[in-house]
Amino acid sequence: DGRTLRLNSLEFRVYFERVFREQTQVATTLAFAQDEASRIRYETLLQLEDALLEACADLNALAAARRDNRALGRRLQARMATTAPSCEATTRRTSEALDAL
């Protein structure tokens, strides 16, 4: 919704978790769709996957670091966290594209 959230706020943690879970769900759906796809459709799915992985790479890395209790600097965490809206938007577009296939 365009609001700025503090990294250490509960609101941000909830938002981060939601975006991460949605992205993971769409990535899983995408992987299963690739298994069943025709060659032409498979290429489209690969493009969608590449875009999703690129948009969500920092968010996934941040989630992995938190899961593994690895310390990251505040600036790095902040930079990584700023990619959440882009990941969210790409996840939404990917989900819509999957629904349309």
Where on the chain are the PLM-derived regions?
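Immediate post-signal-peptide N-terminus of mature secreted/exported proteins
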Residues: D1-I40
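Long, non-catalytic architectural segments outside compact domain cores
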Residues: D1-L10, T82-P85, A89, R93-L101
